[in-house]
Structures are given as C-alpha cells and as structure tokens.
Amino acid sequence: NTFYCCELCCNPACAGCY
C-alpha cells in the first residue's frame, strides 16, 4: 500500500508532501 501524506506533512516519514 502506498502512503499518501496530507496537505500538512503530519508524518516525518512522508517523502513527498503536496
């Protein structure tokens, strides 16, 4: 499963924030 981060990067593990 691919994890998509939200508008505000709430997860430091998030690679691509948009």
Curated annotation (Swiss-Prot):
In which domain of life is the source organism classified?
Bacteria
Annotated GO molecular function terms are: toxin activity
Q: Which cysteines are joined by disulfide bonds?
A: C5-C10, C6-C14, C9-C17
Q: Which keywords fit this entry according to its UniProt record?
A: Disulfide bond, Enterotoxin, Secreted, Toxin, Virulence
InterPro entries attached here?
Heat-stable_enterotox_CS, Heat-stable_enterotox_STa
Q: Which GO terms describe its cellular component?
A: extracellular space
Keyword Secreted set for record? yes
The record's Pfam families line, in alphabetical order, gives: Enterotoxin_ST
List where in the cell it is found. Secreted
Main localization is secreted
Q: Which family does it belong to?
A: Belongs to the heat-stable enterotoxin family.
The task this protein performs is described as: Toxin which activates the particulate form of guanylate cyclase and increases cyclic GMP levels within the host intestinal epithelial cells.
Name of the molecule in the record = Heat-stable enterotoxin ST-2
